[in-house]
Amino acid sequence: NYDLLKHLPAFTGRIVESADITDRFLWDIRRTQGDLMADNYYGKFTALCHRHNMISYCQPYDRGPMEEMQIGSRIDINVGEFWNNLSSIFQNNWTMRRTVKLSAAIAHTNGQRVVAAESYTGEPESAKWQEYPFGMKALGDKMFSQGLNRIVFHRFAHQPHPTARPGMTMGPWGIHFDRTNTWWEPAKAWHMYIAR
């Protein structure tokens, strides 16, 4: 039981009473925040999804008052992400690449069979109609080896005009993955490969 007003300086890195008491206060407050987020945000979100016969998807990581394993247990499908930077095929961009393995670990710990990922997200340097199946295959294979088994393409919503090419885009942030792309028809074999 803490006097919150008395312990507010602990949030700025100051010691209140003693280092031990300050550490215990910060641990308890962070644990409480994590529990509240897991139950009242992610748990409630999943309950609302189920009430409407929907499945909850979530990326259970990044900065916030939460604990990844705990919130991942409150959702139906854990989702990681990986970005499609053509040069990153040969580099280890662990900032975004590690999330697939994290999501797979959370899913497997909770007995969930599906591990999804926001896949091939474009970056300003690479999302200039430069993506193509051969350039993306190695990255996808690496993510499959980390536990991915459901691709969720990071792309724009629609192409309303049937003959406009190349059509609408998300600007620099999404993969250009739709029927207006010049490689769409020849890429059927790759589509079948990643859908297996």
Model-derived regions: residue spans:
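Carbohydrate-binding surfaces of carbohydrate-active enzymes
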Residues: N1-N78, W83-R196
